[in-house]
Amino acid sequence: MKTKIFCDIAELNLIKKFNKKKIVKGFTTNPSLMRKAGAKDYRSYSKKILSICNNKPVSLEVFADDYVNMKKQAMQINTWAKNVYVKVPIANSKGEFMGRIIKELNSQNIKLNITAIYSAKQTEKILKLINKKT
C-alpha cells in the first residue's frame, strides 16, 4: 500500500506553504474550516485554494443537508477545476445515509471524497453502490 498525505486545512498561507512540499499529495477542507480561516464567500475562497493547488487534488465539501441542494452544490463544485474532488458526507445531519447522491455522482464520473465514515459497515454500503474503477 502506498500512503498519501493530504492536508486538512483552509488557511491560504498554510496551503501555499504545504503545496510546495512534495510529501503533500493534496488538500481537503470543509465549510467550518473555511469560515475559521476567514472565508466570506465559499465559491471564491474555494477557487483561491484551487488556483494555489492547481497541480494537486483538492476536496471541497458540500454544505447542503438535503439531496436536492447537495446535488446542486456537487454539480457546481465539480465545474470549478480539473483537480477538484467533491467531498460528500456518508450521512446528513439527521443520520440519513447519502447513498443515493453518492451513487448518482459516481455514475456521472464525478470525483468523490466520501467523508465521515466511522464503520466497516458504512464502507461496505458504499462499495456496493459505486463503480470501483472510478
Predicted regions and their residues:
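Active-site beta->alpha loop and helix N-cap motifs at the rims of alpha/beta catalytic domains
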Residues: 2-3, 9-16, 21-24, 28-111
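Catalytic alpha/beta core domains of metabolic enzymes, predominantly
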Residues: 110-134
